[in-house]
Amino acid sequence: VKHTLPFFLILLVALADGCDRRSRAVSATGGCDESIKLPEGFCATVFAESAGPVRHLAVRKNGDVIAGVLDQRRTRGGLVVLRDTNHDGHADLEARVGEEGVHGVALGSDSSLYVSTATSVLHYRFGADLAPNPRYDTLITGLPQRRPQSHSLAIDPRNNLIVNIGAASEGCQPTPTPNTPGRDPCPELDSTGGLWSFRTDQTMQGLRNGVRIATGLHNAVALTVNPRDTSVYAVSHGRDMLHEFWPALYSDLDGATAAAEEMIRVASMRADYGWPYCYYSYFANQRVVAPEYGGDKHQTTRCGRQIQPLTVFPAHWAPMAMLFYTGTAFPPAYRTGVFVAFHGSALRAPLPQEGYVVAYVAFKDGLPAGETQIFANGFAGGMMSPEGAEHRPTGLAQDAAGALYVSDDKGGRIWKITWRGAGKD
């Protein structure tokens, strides 16, 4: 089922000024979106339509949904705040703030909002209005721009801000060319390839003011804090370009499948997860030395002391967000684990592209238990490719009632997933 805005509402939103905080009407109607395939008893309704290229989400206690929107071609970025005033499951009121693309969003207290741009983290405050006050504090400045859409955010129990800074290269080579060894030691690890912790009560901090809590992560875009154990978790993008950079060693099939996406828990300060010296081999089920550092697909020297992932996912699925479910609205089978949104692959040729799903990983005794379940599918539509997909999952959030929200940076849609009971549609 596809839903569209009436023309006059499209025109109203298009003409609105980006700095205008006035709330305005929006529309998304219809019942369950049958294009989104879910386990029996679940329903995905279109909460918002045409929100723009949305990355991450947050939900306030009052149910307002906050979305970070990227700059993309002629679409301005910034923050979008959406409200369902009549409680029908669809946003009917919208306010926008800012004109700079936003990737990460994280709520501190219910009135305190942190957002990341290409180079900064900004602190907004909510008052009585739908939108936050447009005057903000610059909490962090000068973040590396080499992978600007990677600055995901999370708040830890001590009210520190956790920031991902993705690595710019695949194997820390001085030039991205075939058969080029990596630099050893890798200077990129000084400022990228890990997670940093910053204080939330200081402004104009630079990278030097942060504390690196994890290193050796290629690009940990999916980032969260588990409320149950208060630990920082992430799902990191595995490396790319194994076949393109090392064609004599890796076939095109190797390049499509070898380097897994890794779910990790930050086990200790400055925990090391291997990049660029090692990567996790999906089929060998262990870390192996990267070819830039003399690896042969099997060698494991210098990888033994690096922390192993909790679980792994297929190569190139592109994990974008993760959320530990804490509600009681979903059945018990979905109350112990974590949802992961996958943007979908672009580099699995000669195999078909994969991903474009929301997966669920059950936990038991603090560890993943059982097989990964594809919880929500059908986002891509008829073609699984970055260009051909109708929608690509990016963000996850949960409201106070236990509904799950999923955002999309391709079609600009936000879904609200609820449990209606087995045998109901």
What are these language model-derived features?
Residues 56, 104, 152, 219-222, ...:
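Conserved beta-strand position repeated once per blade in WD40 beta-propeller domains
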